[in-house]
């Protein structure tokens, strides 16, 4: 039996004040079904960062994983762009 593909998101680090955990904001754009306007929606994910390598402002790729704590279900895959 095949396991489904894990979800992958790209977002910006907004907090790194916890140990081995970062908060990543992922922006989603979609067209409103009735009015047709492009709407921006932001969702924040708590992400496991094993080596504490991320800083606020970094652009990162995250992947879905097994539950690591009450709210952590994502892990860091790579840092795409470091903050200046």
UniProtKB/Swiss-Prot annotation:
The keyword Chaperone does not apply. Pfam families: Ribosomal_S17. GO terms for biological process: translation. Transmembrane segments: none annotated. Signal peptide: none annotated. One of its GO terms (cellular component) is cytosolic small ribosomal subunit. Gene3D superfamilies: Nucleic acid-binding proteins. Keywords: Ribonucleoprotein, Ribosomal protein, RNA-binding, rRNA-binding. Coiled coil: none annotated. GO terms for molecular function: rRNA binding; structural constituent of ribosome. Belongs to the universal ribosomal protein uS17 family. Part of the 30S ribosomal subunit. One of the primary rRNA binding proteins, it binds specifically to the 5'-end of 16S ribosomal RNA. HAMAP family: Ribosomal_uS17_B. This is Small ribosomal subunit protein uS17. It comes from Caldanaerobacter subterraneus subsp. tengcongensis (strain DSM 15242 / JCM 11007 / NBRC 100824 / MB4) (Thermoanaerobacter tengcongensis). The gene is rpsQ.
